[in-house]
Amino acid sequence: MIPHPPQVRIAPGFRPVLAVLCLLGVSSALTAEDAPDPAAILNAARMNQSRQSAELTGQLRTAADKAPFRLTVDNGKITYQFQDPDQGIVLVLGTKDSELFERMGGRKSDITPARYDRPVRQSGITYEDLAMKFLYWPNPKLLGSDSVRTRAAWKLEMQAPRATSQYGVARVWVDKQSGALLRVEGFDDSGRLRRRFEVVSAQKVDGEWILKQMRVETFDPSTRKVVSRDYLEIDGATVAAPSPAP
């Protein structure tokens, strides 16, 4: 008989709102007495994001410019609203996959894989990063325990399905207490680091922990040197209680 993997338990209480890769992660505490099943860790993160509501304002800051935005999270739909030019980028988190589309000039259109490697607002973030496809890649591996800025985390690795991504492998660090994504790294097909997203600081708003600053670093795979360093910063938020589980 094959034993069942340890269950991931989602407990009430500490519910941080963390925008990671503009990956906005809203999660309840994720704990397990033993190392949990990696697929359960990712599933818990996806499910919790789809149950939260929040309104955030901030900016995407590059070396050359700042792009203010409003970020709305509502029951599985995450909307990034930019101005000058007006652009809405909408992420819908499903149970088996995510969808990404754009609203410009009153028109809605799908953001197809052909655009996934293009930068968002001339930053180091690409449309694929916003789509969060790596959270759905099959057969994740648990590499063990680690820490990110003193926070205990599970470290996982996912292999991209063939010819579907600019990345070959993604590694993620998931906070053991909150279930939030603390760091994400994307590697090319040769195992060379291309991009790193890391939560630098958090802040408390209306009794909830939310992102204050996330750093986005883009690397030259051949030299391993940083070629750009951008920041996603949150300066205000209203966080609503999560929707009840179905």
List where the protein language model places each region.
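Short, exposed beta-strand/loop patches in secreted or surface proteins that constitute
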Residues: 68-74, 90-93, 139-145, 200-202
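Gly/Pro-enriched, hydrophobic low-complexity segments
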Residues: 151-245
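Bacterial N-terminal signal peptides
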Residues: 16-27
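N-terminal secretory signal peptides that target proteins for export/translocation
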Residues: 1-12
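N-terminal cleavable signal peptides for secretion/export
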Residues: 30-75, 216
